[in-house]
Structure formats: C-alpha cells, structure tokens
C-alpha cells in the first residue's frame, strides 16, 4: 500500500449563517498573515502562511452558510464538528516545511463557504505538508465537499449534512460518526478509506469497490453481495432494512483497502 504522509481532513457541523470573517487572534502574533476582508454579499479573506509554524486561527460567522467546499492541492485537512462553539474556526499551519509557499483563500458566495489552499513548491520538499483544520458549530448543511490532490483527509464528530463528498488523489481518507443523510461519496486514487458509521444510522445502501485492494467489512448487511475478480473487489448491501428510499454510501479506491465498521 502506498501511503503519503501528507495530509488529513476532518469535518463537522455548523449552526449560524453570515458572511463575516474575522482577523486572526492576537495570540498568533508570530505568524505573518495578511487578511483582506469585504463584508458584502461575498466575503473574501486571502492569507499567506509561508512563515506560520504554530498556526493562525480566524473565525467565520456561518449563520447564512448552507454548504461548505474545501479544495487543496496538498495539505493535511481536518474537519471537526463542535457543539461548544458558535462560529467556525479556521486554523492553518505551515509546520516545519521550508520548501513551499502556502496561500489560503476563503470566500462566501450564495450561501457557500469556499476554502482554497494552494501550495507553490520552491525547492524539493521532504517535510510534512501544511495542515488545514476547520471546526464547525453544529447545524444542518446541504452539502460538504472536500477535494484534496495530495494528503490524508479526516472527517469526524457530529455533522448534519445531506450530501457528503470527499475525494483524495493520493492519501488516506477517514470518516468517523458523519454520514450524508441523502448521499455520501468517498474516494481516493491511491490510499485507504476507513469509514465508521455513527450510532443508529438511518437505513443505508452501501456500495464499496476497489480496483486493487481488499474490503474489510465489519457491519452486518441485508441482501449482501460480494464479488472478487483477481485483485478487484466489490461489496453491496443495506445497513438496516432494505428500502428503495435509503440514503446511499459509495466508497471507491483505485489502489488501497477499504474498512467499513460500526
């Protein structure tokens, strides 16, 4: 199995909506981050974290936010739901890497909070990638989308979302206690996927597939079918009673194993 110790993403829920992005807290005075903020129908915040080691934390009012979209070319990404906070918290850390410049752009448009992280390679980099951690107050989302070209993704804790889409080009994906009420699509080209169901999930149709790898299923499924072709494997079935209106969970890897558990 090829693992790239690069990035991880974690997710969680939200409760408020607005388009205000605050500047970093004063406790992070050692970070050289410039912030531009426009509080209109669209709010944007652009920062360079090339010299940020410990991490820069900013807050985002999510009263008017119904969707979240995260895009990165290389990072450790974590999204966490937290019922103890009222605003979203965004933390970016460069770590010890000296080989790249990192820029993060946040914007709010049409009810969607978009977070874009881009790294520009200066020299050959052998250090850990920058990390992006997002803590969200609990609320219901229409969609949560994460797309990371290189790096691990971790989605964890409580999150109420209708559609969950998580994708990594190279890296592991871990989803814990979070599921889309209507659909969940989890994939990685090179890496493993571990999906842990929340307690007492609603009826769910499960479709697991790997081109080169194995499937470790630890959940009792109704109408289970399992197909193995040389190095490819597929598993289908229902969690709970089979229903035509069940939510769907699709997990796919090109190269890597899948673990599905309670």
Model-inferred region functions:
Residues 50, 55-69, 76-84, 101-167, ...:
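Right-handed parallel beta-helix
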Residues 1-6:
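Sec-dependent N-terminal signal peptides
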Residues 18-69, 76:
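N-terminal, intrinsically disordered, polar/charged segments of Gram-positive cell-envelope systems
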Residues 175-262:
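Short, surface-exposed interaction patches in beta-rich subdomains
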Residues 10-13:
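C-terminal motif of bacterial Sec signal peptides marking the signal peptidase cleavage site
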Residues 74-75, 83-85, 90-96:
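N-terminal beta-strand/beta-hairpin edge segment
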Residues 15, 92, 102-104:
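Post-signal peptide N-terminal segment of secreted/secretory-pathway proteins
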